[in-house]
Amino acid sequence: MLTVIRRIFIIQTFIFITAEKIFHSRDHSDVLNNIHQAELITDTDTAQRFLSKYGFIKAAGSEESQLSESSGDLDFSLSLDLHEGGTTSGSSSSDLQFVSALRDFQRLSDLPVTGVFDDATKAAMNKPRCGVMDDDQELKDVTGSNSTRNHIRTSTNTSHNHEHQAPVRKKRHLSALLKNTSLQKRDVSKWTGHMAFSKSVLKWRLIGEGYSSQLSIQEQKYIFRLAFRMWSEISPLQFIEDLHSPLENIDIRLGFGTGRHLGCSQRFDGAGREFAHAWFLGDIHFDDDEHFTVPNTGSGISLLKVAVHEIGHVLGLPHIYRPGSIMQPSYLPQDAGFEIDWMDRKSIQRLYGVCTGRFSTVFDWIRKEQTPYGEVVVRFNTYFMRDGLYWLYENRNNRTRYGDPVAVQVGWHGLPSGGVDAYVHVWNRKTDAVYFFKGMQYWRYDSENDHVFSHAPDGRLYPRLISEDFPGVSGPLDTAYYDRRDAHIYFFKGSQVFRFDVRMRRLASSSPQEMTEVFPAIVSGDHPVRSLDAAYFSYTHNTVFLLKGSLFWRVLSGKERRRRAFLPMNGLLAHRRVHEQWFDICDVHSSSLRTTRRR
């Protein structure tokens, strides 16, 4: 009998020991079979649940709007969706409500509006999408009401002729909504719009208990840094990863989870549909059942694109039903080079304002390039510099290059890391020389090899004193530019202008002169007078711009003066704001300067 018992024990022990599951693949591909799959939308019942979940069907007597605006002590991070009980008015009313909601969904999804649950509608509902409820205002818009969305849809998506309008800052601080400071966040699934952070530097953290099981921690953090940087490049917001402050002091917390996760009131539904959701002014959660991938991966869901979308929600943006918008609710596969488009930029700037700031130097860099066919062409690009950073401005697109700013020492080899005071390109039939000025010194730049010259033609080393080679001029300068029309360099210092004749290598006989004399104001009293930040001859506009602070003055062109001969030579037109002419030249936090998109 004892022997039999021992045999049974051995068999049971063997069964227990061999029940351990073995994983063989380093890429965890053998785990995918255990991932929970989201419920498919297959019939009118599942379609009705979908429409209810995302706000197309409202529960009878629902008190959602009152809850979302409450100033009481409800803990929104822990509460369930609460609805006041009510009575139904019968199946016919329910059917009509379903058809109406279905038609709304079809309109917003650019489907034929039939009110019928057809295959196209089914496919649209089964697409991966954000878990944030669709904005009430968006749903009202489909019935024809006047709103912001109508403005967005009718506005042109080309950027060339846009004049920036003053931002409408409709802000309400959450301290007025929630008494408990640790609960100062809102669920964007009940987004009501026109609310924003009241500060411009925001802290974020990928929480330790919320790492993804599919990507390395380094990959996750790189993607989130890049996603935050993309919003920073188009708004006055700056983001910094904070690993040390108490968690309640972190503005935006990110994490991955499945099903019931991270103490959240919402459940994830598994792979295949809802990939993430966000809480206004607070948290972003990603469904770790989804197959998230790094940029430049052909399959799966781009974590970068999803992160940019969800950060948009946290910052205050609702879903936007417009082709090209990063805020569309459904995931649309895009190429690896997707960016935040013009209208999404304007949407975030309506909440936070536009980027402003003074520049130390602005110039067009001209150089010769050889085409693949062996032809030599002359090209130029516009650059803005300040505080040791530079932006390349794409005039044809009216925006900065994606991924800017960049540190000066990275892109302009050999220049002072803090930037420069002035740029001059002497370009005529006999001379093609680029100079940068800083303090009392100047450097000559080799545009062909993209670095400063180490030696002058006479063998002396660069940098050299400005006064040595530009007699009558000494640093530090405010700014300078070369005017091809009269072959003079215009040096600006205080209220004076020094005109330097490059052919004769000396100052013009009338120099120095007062800036108000050389560049008279067309509108009386409208003049920078002294201490310019930058003077810049633009080959795009074929004229000179003078910049000071947040303002600029355009110098009357020769063509304009020929049409209106009564106007003074070099007259300054009425000032305008820099951000009205050159859009989205925005700073990023110093910690994200090296975060660039990998190719």
Swiss-Prot record:
<dbReference type="InterPro" id="IPR002477">
    <property type="entry name" value="Peptidoglycan-bd-like"/>
</dbReference>
<dbReference type="GO" id="GO:0006508">
    <property type="term" value="P:proteolysis"/>
</dbReference>
<protein>
    <recommendedName>
        <fullName>Matrix metallopeptidase-21</fullName>
        <ecNumber>3.4.24.-</ecNumber>
    </recommendedName>
</protein>
<dbReference type="Pfam" id="PF00413">
    <property type="entry name" value="Peptidase_M10"/>
</dbReference>
<feature type="binding site">
    <location>
        <position position="309"/>
    </location>
    <ligand>
        <name>Zn(2+)</name>
    </ligand>
</feature>
<dbReference type="InterPro" id="IPR036365">
    <property type="entry name" value="PGBD-like_sf"/>
</dbReference>
<feature type="propeptide">
    <location>
        <begin position="21"/>
        <end position="170"/>
    </location>
</feature>
<dbReference type="GO" id="GO:0031012">
    <property type="term" value="C:extracellular matrix"/>
</dbReference>
<dbReference type="GO" id="GO:0007368">
    <property type="term" value="P:determination of left/right symmetry"/>
</dbReference>
<feature type="repeat" description="Hemopexin 3">
    <location>
        <begin position="474"/>
        <end position="522"/>
    </location>
</feature>
<feature type="repeat" description="Hemopexin 1">
    <location>
        <begin position="356"/>
        <end position="415"/>
    </location>
</feature>
<feature type="active site">
    <location>
        <position position="310"/>
    </location>
</feature>
<feature type="region of interest" description="Disordered">
    <location>
        <begin position="141"/>
        <end position="170"/>
    </location>
</feature>
<dbReference type="InterPro" id="IPR006026">
    <property type="entry name" value="Peptidase_Metallo"/>
</dbReference>
<dbReference type="InterPro" id="IPR036375">
    <property type="entry name" value="Hemopexin-like_dom_sf"/>
</dbReference>
<keyword id="KW-0325">Glycoprotein</keyword>
<dbReference type="GO" id="GO:0004222">
    <property type="term" value="F:metalloendopeptidase activity"/>
</dbReference>
<keyword id="KW-1015">Disulfide bond</keyword>
<feature type="binding site">
    <location>
        <position position="319"/>
    </location>
    <ligand>
        <name>Zn(2+)</name>
    </ligand>
</feature>
<dbReference type="GO" id="GO:0060971">
    <property type="term" value="P:embryonic heart tube left/right pattern formation"/>
</dbReference>
<dbReference type="InterPro" id="IPR018487">
    <property type="entry name" value="Hemopexin-like_repeat"/>
</dbReference>
<dbReference type="InterPro" id="IPR033739">
    <property type="entry name" value="M10A_MMP"/>
</dbReference>
<dbReference type="GO" id="GO:0030574">
    <property type="term" value="P:collagen catabolic process"/>
</dbReference>
<comment type="function">
    <text>Plays a specialized role in the generation of left-right asymmetry during embryogenesis. May act as a negative regulator of the NOTCH-signaling pathway.</text>
</comment>
<feature type="signal peptide">
    <location>
        <begin position="1"/>
        <end position="20"/>
    </location>
</feature>
<dbReference type="InterPro" id="IPR024079">
    <property type="entry name" value="MetalloPept_cat_dom_sf"/>
</dbReference>
<feature type="repeat" description="Hemopexin 2">
    <location>
        <begin position="417"/>
        <end position="473"/>
    </location>
</feature>
<dbReference type="InterPro" id="IPR001818">
    <property type="entry name" value="Pept_M10_metallopeptidase"/>
</dbReference>
<dbReference type="GO" id="GO:0030198">
    <property type="term" value="P:extracellular matrix organization"/>
</dbReference>
<feature type="binding site">
    <location>
        <position position="313"/>
    </location>
    <ligand>
        <name>Zn(2+)</name>
    </ligand>
</feature>
<dbReference type="GO" id="GO:0061371">
    <property type="term" value="P:determination of heart left/right asymmetry"/>
</dbReference>
<dbReference type="Pfam" id="PF01471">
    <property type="entry name" value="PG_binding_1"/>
</dbReference>
<feature type="disulfide bond">
    <location>
        <begin position="355"/>
        <end position="586"/>
    </location>
</feature>
<feature type="compositionally biased region" description="Polar residues">
    <location>
        <begin position="143"/>
        <end position="159"/>
    </location>
</feature>
<dbReference type="GO" id="GO:1901207">
    <property type="term" value="P:regulation of heart looping"/>
</dbReference>
<feature type="repeat" description="Hemopexin 4">
    <location>
        <begin position="529"/>
        <end position="585"/>
    </location>
</feature>
<feature type="binding site" description="in inhibited form">
    <location>
        <position position="130"/>
    </location>
    <ligand>
        <name>Zn(2+)</name>
    </ligand>
</feature>
<dbReference type="InterPro" id="IPR021190">
    <property type="entry name" value="Pept_M10A"/>
</dbReference>
<comment type="similarity">
    <text>Belongs to the peptidase M10A family.</text>
</comment>
<feature type="glycosylation site" description="N-linked (GlcNAc...) asparagine">
    <location>
        <position position="398"/>
    </location>
</feature>
<keyword id="KW-0862">Zinc</keyword>
<dbReference type="GO" id="GO:0008270">
    <property type="term" value="F:zinc ion binding"/>
</dbReference>
